[in-house]
């Protein structure tokens, strides 16, 4: 199931009784702050998980069209690691 920021703001609006515009601004601010922090350092949200930027090293690859070897450039990836509590909650709900 995919959930959008708009759906999250609508859920907040209905649960908290705030206007949808206010909840949308809150959700956008939270996500942009998470992104800004995660770009610079590891971000851990207690009982949820951690966001961390990892640098992938350059590696050899193959161009599928020409079959010639190429070097794949290094790049940064955002990695999410769920907390043990979140994993337990997910596994509990699957039973």
From Swiss-Prot:
Intrachain S-S bonds: none
Assigned keywords, A-Z: DNA-binding
UniProt similarity note: Belongs to the bacterial histone-like protein family.
Matching Gene3D superfamilies: IHF-like DNA-binding proteins (4.10.520.10)
Residues annotated as signal peptide: none
GO molecular function ontology, one term from the record: DNA binding
SUPFAM superfamilies registered for this protein in UniProt: IHF-like DNA-binding proteins
Protein name: Histone-like DNA-binding protein
CC terms in the record's Gene Ontology section: cytosol
